[in-house]
Amino acid sequence: MNILDEYLKEKGFITNKEAEKLGIKRYKLAELVHKGKLERVKNGVYKKKGDIDDELVLISYNNEKVVFSFHTALFLLGLSDRIPNSFHISVPQGYNVGHIKKRMNNIKVHYIKKENFDIGIITVKTAFGNEVKCYDMERSICDIVSERNAMDKQIFVDAITGYFNSKGKNMRNLIKYSRILGVEDEIRKYMEVL
């Protein structure tokens, strides 16, 4: 169980496939669940018994096409201090999210044109130290500007002012993304004001 302990300490979760790569058979995982040492989180995914679930990892685990966006990305990037009450994910148009929605009922899905999906994807750490994919600050700002009428005004204002006051902002990418995503005029208005 030493290899497994180290893996779980680093990653938090393990899949059947990952366990097999480490030389741990599936029946051994089932045995550890039965003994109360592991907990089955979902089909083929296990964690140490008693560990706190990192819901962001659970949502994105084995879902390569899931990227956290909108409110969730703003929170992960430090542009919002409000913990989202539902997780906002973006997927390419045509991607089937039924398996995710079946497990989690607090998901808001945004379907993105395939040609725009990969723009601004980065990897960030969750509060638990696990890595997940989300859109960068510039893409997130473009996204919320495009959906500003559907957003909570305070979250929107905090994110916009937080971005323009941020030392890590990349104005070149902001303009580039805004042009591709069709919100350049709106972005330029905010740039003039802030």
Spans of features found by a protein language model:
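Short amphipathic alpha-helical interface segments
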Residues: M1-F13
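TRNA-binding/sensing appendages of the translation machinery
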Residues: N2, N16, Y27
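Conserved short "hinge" loops at termini or chain/domain junctions
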Residues: E10, T15-K17, L22, K42
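Nucleic-acid-binding surface
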Residues: I14-K17, V33, K47-L194
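Short amphipathic alpha-helical interaction segments
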Residues: K21-H34
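A short, conserved structural fragment
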Residues: G36-N43
